[in-house]
């Protein structure tokens, strides 16, 4: 039998990290078992579901590279199918019409609460014949009253729930629309889902859904209920912890590989290994290895992984992701070095692509002024002679090469009988406007000969004005 999993988000907001991790685990389980992965949009909450949220979820999945084999399916386009199954269940006697008013239900629950009893529907309409009336009604599933539901969860082990604790679940509302718990069951059956991976907040729904599947004569999938993600204060991760949608991580400069690597480790492990390629995840991932305890989100760890991937991935690939940030920061890269070369030069220090883009601006644009601290320290009177001499030697280079630039700087230091830093630091500030950059010869090479000439002249003028002031 082909392994088939699904990710079934509700389009009421962005794709958050918890949902992304669930999608990743489900996707990995399918890929690890040469199976299929289905994307399904559970949009039955018509009032809260929006096209914008749906688009954000699809965009997030695509950016992460979690490709799907089927879908996206939309529940709102399957109402005819749900109604067909409900009609069958009414005819078979596994569902019934409930005419109890909202007021009666509320009174019943208040009385149960006052007695310390479990609050659930009392079955008033369960065995009554349907009425020939225009009274409003809901449709309820006739849950078994004896026995129990037993299932083996990949994460939590064996779970058993007595049927007398379960309600007669509403499967169709008064206006006729099917409910979430019912739609999920029909979808999983129709789509041949063999394993359901989802958050632990759904675990109470599972025995109810299993009973509906049994009533339909449908196969029961495997289940894996994943623990929640916590903030650093031990509370459930939320917006107040800075929890954001997946695409915000793109906007903040994270690579999809870094976020996927971080999310897979947020509850799953393989020995002490921290860094996993996508291929390694596919080979090693097992649902049974997921930790049942909640995991705490750690931004520092994510930053460490992101820096690792910026340094280790192919610069051409990283440059493709960097393009978005350059455009976002309005940096025109048409007149300057190849972005891949900039990635190679700056990758050692950048934690995010957003930082990398910001620190690369001087390769493409002239700066208005020198950093005050760097200028105060390095563009002093003693810098005049090294700057003038190195400018002359650089201008004499017939070819603009790393070797030639390095030799010009070294010859200047030798001729003036000073250390390389006495030439290199003023030169760095002159060309970049700041006190930090990659190796000064590489920096000059990427900035280009003409720009270097102009900027060194500007620095010499700055030093002269400082001497004369």
Curated annotation (Swiss-Prot):
Q: Motif 'HIGH' region, which positions?
A: 9-19
This enzyme catalyses: tRNA(Glu) + L-glutamate + ATP = L-glutamyl-tRNA(Glu) + AMP + diphosphate
Q: Which residues bind Zn(2+)?
A: 98, 100, 125, 127
Cofactor or coenzyme needed: Zn(2+)
Q: Which organism is it from?
A: Shewanella sediminis (strain HAW-EB3)
Enzyme class per UniProt: ligase
Task: Report the protein's function.
Answer: Catalyzes the attachment of glutamate to tRNA(Glu) in a two-step reaction: glutamate is first activated by ATP to form Glu-AMP and then transferred to the acceptor end of tRNA(Glu).
One Gene Ontology term, aspect cellular component: cytosol
Instruction: Name the gene that codes for it.
Output: gltX
Its protein name is: Glutamate--tRNA ligase
Localization, UniProt: Cytoplasm
Broad class of the protein's primary localization: cytoplasm
For this chain the motif 'KMSKS' region maps to: 236-240
Q: What are the GO MF terms of this UniProt record?
A: ATP binding; glutamate-tRNA ligase activity; tRNA binding; zinc ion binding
């Amino acid at each position: 039998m082909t392994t088939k999993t699904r990710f079934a988000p509700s389009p009421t907001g962005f794709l958050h990290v918890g949902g992304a991790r669930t999608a990743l685990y489900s996707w990995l389980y399918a890929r690890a078992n040469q199976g299929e992965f289905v994307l399904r949009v559970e949009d039955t909450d018509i009032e809260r579901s929006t096209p914008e949220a749906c688009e954000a979820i699809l965009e997030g999945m695509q950016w992460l590279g979690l490709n799907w084999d089927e879908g996206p399916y939309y529940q709102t386009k399957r109402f005819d199918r749900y109604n067909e199954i409900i009609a069958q269940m009414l005819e078979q006697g596994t569902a019934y019409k409930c005419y109890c008013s909202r007021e009666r239900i509320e009174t019943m629950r208040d009385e149960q609460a006052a007695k310390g009893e479990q609050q659930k529907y009392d079955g008033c309409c369960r065995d009554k014949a349907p009425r020939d009336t225009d009274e409003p009604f809901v449709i309820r599933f006739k849950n078994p009253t004896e026995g129990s539901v037993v299932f083996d969860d990949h994460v939590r082990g064996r779970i058993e729930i007595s049927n007398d604790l379960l309600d007669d679940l509403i499967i169709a509302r008064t206006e006729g629309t099917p409910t979430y718990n019912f739609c999920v069951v029909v979808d999983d059956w129709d789509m041949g889902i063999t394993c359901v991976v989802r958050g632990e907040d759904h675990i109470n729904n599972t025995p109810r859904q299993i009973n509906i599947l049994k009533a339909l004569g449908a196969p029961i999938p495997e289940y894996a209920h994943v623990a929640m993600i916590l903030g650093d204060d031990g509370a459930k991760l939320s917006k107040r912890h800075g929890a954001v949608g997946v695409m915000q991580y793109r906007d903040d400069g994270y690579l999809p590989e870094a976020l996927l690597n971080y999310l897979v480790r947020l509850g799953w492990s393989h020995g002490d290994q921290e860094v996993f390629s996508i291929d390694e995840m596919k080979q090693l991932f097992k649902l049974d290895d997921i930790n049942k305890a909640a995991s705490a989100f750690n931004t520092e760890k994510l930053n460490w992984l992101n820096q690792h991937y910026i340094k280790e991935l192919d610069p051409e690939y990283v440059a493709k992701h960097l393009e978005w940030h350059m455009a976002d920061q309005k940096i025109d890269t048409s007149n300057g070095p190849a972005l891949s070369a900039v990635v190679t030069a700056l990758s050692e220090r950048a934690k995010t692509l957003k930082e990398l883009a910001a620190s690369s601006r001087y390769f493409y644009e002239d700066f208005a002024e020198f950093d005050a601290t760097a200028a105060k320290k390095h563009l002093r009177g003693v810098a005049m002679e090294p700057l003038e001499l190195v400018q002359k030697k650089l201008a004499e280079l017939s070819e603009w090469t790393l070797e030639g630039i390095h030799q010009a700087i070294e010859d200047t230091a030798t001729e003036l009988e000073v250390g390389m830093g006495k030439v290199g630091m003023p030169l760095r500030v002159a060309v970049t406007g700041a006190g930090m950059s990659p190796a000064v010869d590489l920096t000059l090479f990427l900035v280009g000969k003409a720009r270097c000439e102009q900027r060194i002249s500007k620095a010499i003028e700055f030093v002269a004005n400082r001497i004369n002031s």
